[in-house]
C-alpha cells in the first residue's frame, strides 16, 4: 500500500531504531537549535504533482509538504518553503545550493548517488505506486498514451504502452484531461493523482487501475552545504509518526464531497 513504512533505515547512525517517540541526543538538540526562526531551513518540492505537492497562491500544499511540516514540527526545526510555480523553476532551485537547503521529494536510484553528491538522506517515507487512468469505455488497447515532456529516455509510457503514439502534455493533470476528452487512451500517473482526478470528475466517465509495479520510493535529501545529521534527526521524527499518516493526509485531497464538486466544476468551466 502506498505510504507503507520501510523498516530499513538508511541513516548509518540509527540502524537499530525500531521504537517510536525517540529522544534526541544533546548533539542533535544543538543542531536543531541552529535552525531557529532567524535561520530557517529552505525546503523544496515539485509544484506540479497535485495532490502530492503543488503551489496554491504562493503556498506549498499537498501530501508531501503536509508530511514534512509534521516531522519538522515534531523535531522543532524552523523551515521555510521555496515556492516555485513551474517545474522549470523547481529544477532551477534544485541546482542552486545557495537557496535550497533540502529537497523533500527525492527519488534516488541508488544510495551511492546521494553519497557522490555529498547529500544527507533520510529513510524512505513514501512509496508511490502507479495507476493507469482511462475512460470507462476503454477496450484494453492503448493506441495513444499521454506523457509529460521530461528527460527520461526509457519512460514509463515506453514500458507500459510499447509502440503507442505519445501525446505530449505539459502537466500530469493535462495528461488525464486529454484522456477524459478522448484525445488519448491512457495516462500513467501516481496513484493518489489518479484517485483525486477520478473522484473529482463529475462526468462519471473516468476510472483508474492501481498497478503493482513499478513502485518509486521517495526520501528527503539534505544539501551538501547543510549538516547531514539533520537527515538522522528527521528520520527519527518519521519513525515517531502514526503509521497511517501518509494515507490520512492523502484522504484530505482525494475524497470529495458534493459541495466541493461544484467548485471543481466551476474551475473546469472557466
Model-inferred region functions:
Residues 50, 65, 69, 73-74, ...:
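Acidic, polar ligand-binding/catalytic clefts
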Residues 9-11, 21, 81, 121-122, ...:
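Conserved beta-strand scaffold positions in the cores of enzyme catalytic domains, especially
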Residues 42-44, 131, 221:
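Soluble periplasmic/extracytoplasmic beta-strand elements of cell-envelope proteins
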Residues 21-111, 158-159, 163-181, 234:
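Extracytoplasmic small-molecule ligand-binding "clamshell" domains
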Residues 182, 186, 191, 200-201:
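Extracytoplasmic/periplasmic ligand-binding sensor domains
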Amino acid at each position: 500500500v502506498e505510504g507503507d513504512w520501510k523498516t530499513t533505515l538508511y541513516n548509518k547512525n540509527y540502524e537499530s531504531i525500531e521504537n517510536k517517540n525517540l529522544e534526541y541526543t544533546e548533539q542533535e538538540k544543538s543542531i536543531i537549535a541552529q535552525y531557529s526562526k532567524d535561520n530557517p531551513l529552505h525546503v523544496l518540492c515539485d509544484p506540479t504533482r497535485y495532490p502530492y505537492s503543488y503551489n496554491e497562491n504562493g503556498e506549498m500544499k499537498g501530501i508531501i509538504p503536509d508530511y514534512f511540516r509534521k516531522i519538522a514540527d515534531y523535531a522543532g526545526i524552523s523551515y521555510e518553503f521555496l515556492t516555485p510555480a513551474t517545474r522549470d523553476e523547481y529544477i532551477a532551485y534544485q541546482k542552486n545550493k545557495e537557496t535550497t537547503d533540502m529537497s523533500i521529494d527525492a527519488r534516488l536510484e541508488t544510495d551511492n548517488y546521494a553519497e557522490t553528491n555529498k547529500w544527507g538522506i533520510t529513510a524512505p517515507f513514501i512509496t508511490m505506486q502507479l495507476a493507469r487512468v482511462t475512460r470507462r469505455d476503454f477496450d484494453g488497447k492503448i493506441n495513444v498514451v499521454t506523457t509529460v515532456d521530461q528527460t527520461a529516455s526509457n519512460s514509463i509510457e515506453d514500458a507500459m504502452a510499447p509502440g503507442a503514439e505519445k501525446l505530449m502534455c505539459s502537466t500530469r493533470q493535462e495528461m488525464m484531461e486529454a484522456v477524459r476528452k478522448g484525445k488519448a487512451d491512457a495516462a500513467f500517473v501516481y496513484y493518489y493523482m489518479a484517485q483525486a482526478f477520478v473522484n473529482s470528475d463529475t462526468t462519471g466517465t473516468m476510472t483508474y487501475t492501481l498497478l503493482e509495479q513499478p513502485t518509486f520510493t521517495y526520501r528527503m535529501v539534505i544539501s551538501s552545504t547543510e549538516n547531514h545529521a539533520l537527515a538522522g534527526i528527521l528520520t527519527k521524527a518519521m519513525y515517531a509518526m502514526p503509521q497511517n499518516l501518509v494515507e490520512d493526509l492523502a484522504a484530505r485531497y482525494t475524497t470529495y464531497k458534493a459541495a466541493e464538486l461544484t467548485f471543481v466544476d466551476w474551475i473546469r468551466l472557466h
